[in-house]
Amino acid sequence: MSNDRKKKVLITGGYGFIGSSFIRNLSKNENYIIGNIDKLTYSSNLNSLEKVTNKNNYTFFQEDICNKESIREIIFSFEPNYIIHLAAETHVDRSIDGPEVFLKTNILGTYNLLNSSKEYYEKINGQDNKDFKFLLVSTDEVYGSLETNQEKFT
């Protein structure tokens, strides 16, 4: 990789609500090459990226972030400048009924991404190494509920 090339952004969970919005906006800028990793689960919306899928700066990888070998292969072959991790099991009520899939995806999947990203980061040199970023996007659910008598915060 070199600085005169377009920046490559690898996004997980790109067919989700936030991920698809991010990709639609980012795809308008031809200075970015976009990779989208998504397992395509119940919360994926294939229609959300219908105007993006045929663009030259977009590639889709249907994969589970829990598949360590595939995730490593995607990262090393795509050679991203930035990884934006949005993939997660959502809907708190579902986590109460079946926590295993939440633990697997949200913890093990994130761990796999971090390990492969670290390995990739240690491989790249020069400015690409200095510019590389890994961004984890979470949810407001991690803060818990705000009681009605508590002061609001942002």
What residue spans do the PLM features occupy?
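N-terminal Rossmann-like NAD(P)+-binding domain of SDR-like oxidoreductases, especially those catalyzing
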Residues: M1-T154
